[in-house]
Amino acid sequence: MNKNTNDFEIMAPIGSRESLAAAINAGANSVYFGIGKLNMRSHSANHFTIDDLKEIAETCNAKGIQTYLTVNTVIYGEDIETMHEIIDAAKAANITAVIASDVAVMMYCRQVGVEVHLSTQLNISNIDALKFYAQFADVAVLARELNMDQVKEIHEQIIKQNICGPKGQPIRIEMFCHGAFCMAISGKCYMSLHDSNRSANRGACTQICRRSYTVTDNETGNQLEIDNKYIMSPKDLKSVRFIDKMMDAGVRVFKIEGRARGPEYVHTVVSCYKEAIESVLDGTFTEEKKDQWDERLSTVFNRGFWDGYYQGQKMGEWTKDYGNKATEKKVLIGKVIKYFSRLGVAEVAVEANTFVKGEKLLITGNSTGAMFLNAEEIRYDLNPVDKAEQGWRVSIPVPDKVRPNDKLFKLVVN
């Protein structure tokens, strides 16, 4: 493969300042986020507001990181004015691009000079559809239901037919590489609206597909035996073991799902996929590394993993349990009081739970992001101790700068 790391982009999800810092520190090339209304996670993440756009853009631009604002819900007539306000604010803040699914959003972005990327909600599955949308957008997310042979064919046709976006460059292909999978095609689900009058297509999904269900014969009242109660809850996508095939197929932007996830999720997933892409490029993409990435990815939020449809699988794989199957869970200990830069030591308040020497710790914060460390040493009143008790203030060595009021957790086997 005659490529370098600059040809590929890892796009991180952010729903909070903590996850933004985690994405930056882990080496993401771009971030995507919403600001309340008109995005597909408007009810499930700690969203930023329109007033945060300038700060986010300035923070990311200083690091050379692209910023993508999601305005990708169904748009009704009464939403047009709000949509215009959001796009105008994005332009004023120097946001890199808007992720859109409604043509009204695309047209207004083009009118005012804002770059457009196509959302997964469009379910783009063939070259003719992509050619139509190329008049609006420079980057397109292809449908998650495609396999890599189909993706490669689309990529080859982009090159052969010289299908370019408004910037005059060939359309870049973006694909989801990791995270939650919807039971409906490209997320176009109506179950939540039917059950709770909350539309998934307006960012208000209640995720009732994640519950367990029984099948009952209405005439007899008998319940039918099924092999899995979670008949509509897919496992999460994980592609790190075959990221090389995605790169070969023409995928250039690797999108991570998870705007509602914590900073430890963002940091872990971004760093694993960044390492994987670099390993493919430098010829060290080994089975041993794949196993290590698998292990690390299993420690953060997941519902079990499968390959999606990317390698030709026709049927979905469903989770066997409800909720998070991560191998580790975080337990709140307390907070950071002070950081001593010359010593590389943090003073922490032990408030909610104790911790002992050798335990795995996590520190999170708006600027710190997610910092993983081991409690190699604990000192209380300058004396070494093996256990930090509730109510104590202790000092621990940390690998980098932390800030007052950063949260301290221990990570325990789940």
Report residues per predicted region.
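Aromatic- and glycine-enriched glycan-recognition loops and surfaces
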Residues: 45-54
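Well-ordered mid-protein domain cores that form the structural environment of catalytic cofactors
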Residues: 83-119
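Short, glycine/polar-rich helix-capping loops at beta-to-alpha or helix-loop-helix junctions
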Residues: 125-130
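Surface-exposed amphipathic alpha-helical tracts and adjacent flexible/coil segments at the periphery
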Residues: 1-26, 30-42, 56-57, 63-73, ...
